[in-house]
A protein has these predicted regions:
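A short, small-residue-rich loop immediately preceding and capping a beta-strand
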Residues: 83-120
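Short glycine/serine/threonine-rich phosphate/pyrophosphate-binding segments
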Residues: 20, 43-47, 73, 98-105, ...
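Active-site segments that bind and position negatively charged phosphate/pyrophosphate groups
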Residues: 193-303, 310
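Solvent-exposed alpha-helices and their adjacent loops that cap or buttress functional pockets
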Residues: 5-7, 27-29, 84-86, 107, ...
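A glycine/threonine-rich phosphate-anchoring loop and its flanking beta-alpha core
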Residues: 108-201
Length: 355
């Protein structure tokens, strides 16, 4: 039986300069007592803005939780208990991808409304109903599929533009794969991250990711390198966070993400998620013999995304480790079922070496 089309997205998305200090006006829709999660670096940089955003709207003084550890199931369950014990009625996550995954999982287990405030455009997870859980050693554990998307996403483009440039470029890598993975999922009659078929809206959003990167990606990086925001930067941030978030979740994931997650078994792989996805995409496009391969390779070269094992710092990887990565990729049955081109473990190892 054919799958029904299923779409999901955040309850509300707000983007613009200075919005972090104005978040109180939006949070008042969700509750009055927030459990606010961030890491030490975020607190040092943004604490005053965060507090002002609450005080301006007469919200209760938030409960601040500083956490620098991994996003493990045990950790988030304990924080969910703490949020409830402190009588909080909403969860707010402020930070990068890991911190937002933590906030999502805490809100899920505490059964509370959720607001996420990304401080970088390094990945497309903020808008999704997915939290990525890891083991204590940092290796990939599983996707925690949430009952709903975040109720509110607030993106302060001044904050995001000030993030390390490598993070935004990594976000381009994540967004770059969105269209091709959604296209593969649709061709394979696969399931998106909601368990349904990708619909037209999701595929349009996914395609818009690719078009936006081709139009604005290089210019946006140039502007960010000079320390300035611009229309190109605003479009890139929307692409990395919103368009790619909707596109991957409602469009589906395939080989590129399976490879990125497979690489996490290697302690020596220090690549950011989006960088690993970019490499995975190159492998996927080679497998599919996609006509866009050369354009993708040129774009990656211009913005500084990795396309080879050597670029990832894995030029000396052993055959045994490569086989281990291939085994991990094939254990990701959910993503691999959406890959339109058939591949064996042996062929995958060959493609990774040739990329």
């Amino acid at each position: 039986m054919a799958l029904p089309m299923v779409y999901g997205g955040p309850g509300r998305y707000v983007q613009g300069p200075g919005e972090l200090s104005r978040q109180g006006r939006y949070l008042s829709w969700l509750g009055c007592a927030a459990y606010v999660l961030f890491d030490q670096g975020t607190e040092d940089r943004l604490c005053r803005q965060i507090v002002d955003g609450f005080l301006d709207e007469d919200l209760s003084e938030p409960f601040f939780k500083i956490y620098n550890g991994p996003c493990t199931e045990d950790a988030v369950v304990e924080m969910a208990k703490e949020a409830r014990a402190e009588y909080c009625d909403m969860v707010v996550g402020i930070g990068g991808g890991k911190m937002l995954d933590i906030a999502k999982a805490v809100a899920f287990y505490a059964e509370l409304p959720l607001c996420v405030c990304p401080t970088a455009a390094s990945m497309d997870g903020p808008c999704s109903a997915i939290s990525v859980l890891y083991h204590e050693d940092g290796s990939f554990d599983r996707y925690l599929m949430l009952e709903k998307n975040p109720d509110l996403v607030v993106v302060d483009t001044n904050v995001v533009a000030a993030a390390p440039l490598r993070m935004t470029v990594a976000g381009m890598g994540d967004a770059l794969a969105t269209y091709f993975e959604a296209r593969s999922c649709a061709a394979a009659h696969g399931a998106n991250e909601h368990g349904g078929a990708p619909g037209h809206l999701a595929l349009v959003a996914a395609r818009a990711c690719y078009d936006t990167l081709m139009e604005c990606g290089v210019a946006a990086k140039r502007d960010l390198k000079k320390g300035r925001t611009s229309p190109a930067v605003e479009r890139l941030i929307e692409c990395n966070i919103l368009l790619s978030g909707v596109g991957f979740e409602s469009g589906g994931l395939a080989l590129a993400h399976a490879i990125a997650n497979g690489l996490t078994i290697l302690p020596e792989c220090k690549a950011m998620h989006g960088e690993a996805v970019a490499f995975g995409l190159v492998v996927q496009l080679r497998l599919e013999r996609a006509p866009e391969l050369d354009q993708v390779l040129e774009f990656c070269q211009r913005v500084g995304l990795p396309t080879t094992l050597e670029d990832l710092g894995l030029g000396e990887i052993s055959d045994a480790d490569l086989q281990g990565v291939a085994n991990a990729v094939f254990r990701n049955e959910r993503n691999m079922a959406n890959e339109q081109a058939k591949v064996t473990k042996q062929k995958l190892v060959q493609l990774m070496c040739e990329a």
